Amino acid sequence: PALSHLSLKASYSLTADRGPSYVTNSLAVIKASTPWRPTSGDTETGLKVSSLENAQLTYEKKHELNLGLDVGFVNNRINLAFDWYKRNNFDLIGTVTTQGIGGEISKYGNVAEMKSQGVELSLFTRNIERKDFKWQTNFIFAWMDNEVTKLKTMTRMIDYITGTGYSMEGTPRGSLFSLKFKGLNEMGIPTFLAADGSITSTNIQFQETVNMSNLVYEGPVDPTITGSLGNIFKWKGFTLNVFMTYSFGNVVRLDPIFSNGYSDLTAMPREFANRYLNPGDERRTNVPVIASTRQNNDISNLYVAYSAYNYSDVRVAKGDFIRMKEISLSYDFPQSVSSKLRMSGLSLKFQATNPFLIYSDKKLQGQDPEFFNTGGVAVPMPKQFTLTLRVSF
């Protein structure tokens, strides 16, 4: 039959969660302590307030609607699973700055609301099924979108632009913002749009919490589209598996490598080959000059210009990628061969894991977008090549 099976599912829920594990409960937390005394013989037990009462703190809550479809066609040679969800989160917990009433300037509170929706799709097909040849395909696609609809916090400009991802009302959770780069001046010093609308090199207030009209929204730091595509081909005793993964929709902050001063021990990246060198170069390049001692003496706070350049819109790349995740080729020897060797089974397999990237942003200059900015002690995603001989008796 054309339609093999069909099932529909739907659910709606209201759930509550205690929030982050590091957030204390709404009651005061009082713990025993041993106050310091000059001599060990004068010790005594006391009590200390570990956390003040936070009576207005309540659970994080979420309304969620889920709709799903699972259908099969042509004797289940084609199987499709589709799920859609919509969520409304409210009373989300975060830090809030207060007037100091109650003894704390900053404390945890229910400060945010967020709406989100997403789609998850899985498609499995048996494309060809013959005696000596088979071909199967498995395709997975996931899309998500969210928006912070209410937020009562005071966040500094520096937090929005560093690249870790901060939330602003009207944008996705974990968004990246940048200073607007306005080109190099005649000396090769970078210039930017200031909050008052003027063009400046050093009048950038990284600790600003109110007027941030000069920031440019770049996008979320988390991908909005993820998935995979796998194909398995079988011909007689051979099996070829080709598996790819993909991710789109996020942005990454390039490494903050520029400074108003360098030492002989500084490793210069390849961007410096295209830097400003002579008057007029500001018309051909966006890479600032290596500031001289005289420029550092004549221009006060010159370090601000280079810090701002690190966090400008020209230092942002797309985090999109398509990766060849795995390629494997195996061969199962015929029973006639293994029986002659007094074996019940014999197979040989070659497998390559993470062999190469099919696509990534050229701004990353070959760096892995999945590994980018994960930290200096993080281990990059390794390339693995294995050859396996399997023998059974």
Regions found by a protein language model. Name each.
Residues 89-90, 200-202, 249-251, 366-368:
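A short local loop/turn or secondary-structure capping micro-motif enriched for an aromatic residue
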Residues 218-255:
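Glycine-rich, aromatic-lined ligand/substrate-binding cores of catalytic
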Residues 248-346:
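Extracytoplasmic gating/loop element in the C-terminal half of outer-membrane beta-barrel translocons
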Residues 47-49, 208-212, 303-312:
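Short glycine/proline-rich turn/loop motifs
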Residues 1-171, 311-393:
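Extracellular/periplasmic, surface-exposed regions of secreted and cell-surface proteins
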Residues 65, 77-81, 225, 249, ...:
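N-terminal hydrophobic signal/anchor transmembrane helix of membrane proteins
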Residues 22-24, 109, 126-221, 252, ...:
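Conserved small-residue
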Residues 53, 68, 211-213, 226-229:
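Short, hydrophobic/aromatic alpha-helical segments in well-folded domains
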